[in-house]
C-alpha cells in the first residue's frame, strides 16, 4: 500500500506542478492581455484633449469646467508632467469624467480666439530667441507666482470660461489628483 501511494505521488506530482505553473502563466497572460485591451480601446487610456475652438460648443452641450495645460517647447518639466502625471490612470479618469482638457503652447506666435477676443504673441520666441515673453492669452489667464511665470502652468476655468485658479509649475500625480478633486465641485 505504501509503495502504491508513493508511486501515485511520484507520478502525479509533476503534473500538478506543471498544471499550477501553467495556470499562473495563463493568469498572468490574461491580465496582460486585458490591460492591453483596456489601454488600446478604453476611453480612459489617455486624456481626451480638445481644441480651444471646440470648447464653447462642448460646454453648451454638456457643461464642465475646463483645464488648460500651458507648455512651451524644450521645457523639461512640461515633458516630465506629460510622461508621468498626465498618463496616470486615476488622473486620466478624473479629467475625462469631469473636465474638458486643452493643451496650448504658451509661446506660440499664432493668434488665438478666446471668448470673442483675439490674443496674439507680441514678441514670439522665433523672432527673438532670448525673449521671455509668452502669448497674451497665457498672460491673461495665468497669475504670476512670486513675481514670475512658470512652465508648465495648469489653469482651471469655470463653465463660463472664467478663471478659477492657475497652478504654476509641474504638478506631481498625488498633488494633481487633489487639485482635480478639489475643483470638480
Where does each model-flagged region fall?
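Sec-dependent N-terminal signal peptides
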Residues: 4-14
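C-terminal motif of bacterial Sec signal peptides marking the signal peptidase cleavage site
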Residues: 17-19
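N-terminal "domain-start" segment that seeds a small globular fold
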Residues: 25-57
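Short active-site neighborhood of thiol/selenol oxidoreductases, capturing the structured segment around
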Residues: 61-76
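C-type cytochrome heme c attachment motif
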Residues: 73-80, 153-155
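Thioredoxin-like thiol-disulfide oxidoreductase module
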Residues: 89-91, 96-153, 157-163, 182-183
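A short acidic/small-residue loop/turn micro-motif
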Residues: 170-172
Amino acid at each position: 500500500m505504501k509503495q502504491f501511494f508513493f508511486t501515485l505521488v511520484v507520478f502525479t506530482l509533476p503534473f500538478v506542478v506543471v498544471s499550477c505553473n501553467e495556470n499562473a502563466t495563463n493568469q498572468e497572460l490574461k491580465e496582460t492581455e486585458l490591460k492591453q485591451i483596456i489601454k488600446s480601446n478604453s476611453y480612459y487610456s489617455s486624456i481626451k484633449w480638445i481644441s480651444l475652438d471646440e470648447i464653447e460648443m462642448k460646454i453648451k452641450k454638456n457643461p464642465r469646467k475646463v483645464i488648460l495645460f500651458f507648455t512651451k517647447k524644450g521645457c523639461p518639466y512640461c515633458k516630465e508632467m506629460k510622461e508621468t502625471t498626465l498618463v496616470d490612470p486615476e488622473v486620466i479618469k478624473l479629467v475625462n469624467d469631469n473636465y474638458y482638457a486643452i493643451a496650448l503652447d504658451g509661446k506660440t506666435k499664432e493668434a488665438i480666439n478666446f471668448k470673442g477676443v483675439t490674443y496674439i504673441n507680441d514678441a514670439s520666441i522665433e523672432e527673438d530667441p532670448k525673449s521671455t515673453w509668452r502669448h497674451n492669452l497665457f498672460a491673461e489667464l495665468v497669475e504670476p507666482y512670486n513675481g514670475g511665470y512658470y512652465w508648465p502652468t495648469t489653469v482651471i476655468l469655470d463653465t463660463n470660461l472664467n478663471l478659477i485658479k492657475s497652478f504654476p509649475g509641474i504638478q506631481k500625480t498625488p498633488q494633481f489628483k487633489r487639485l482635480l478633486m478639489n475643483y470638480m465641485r
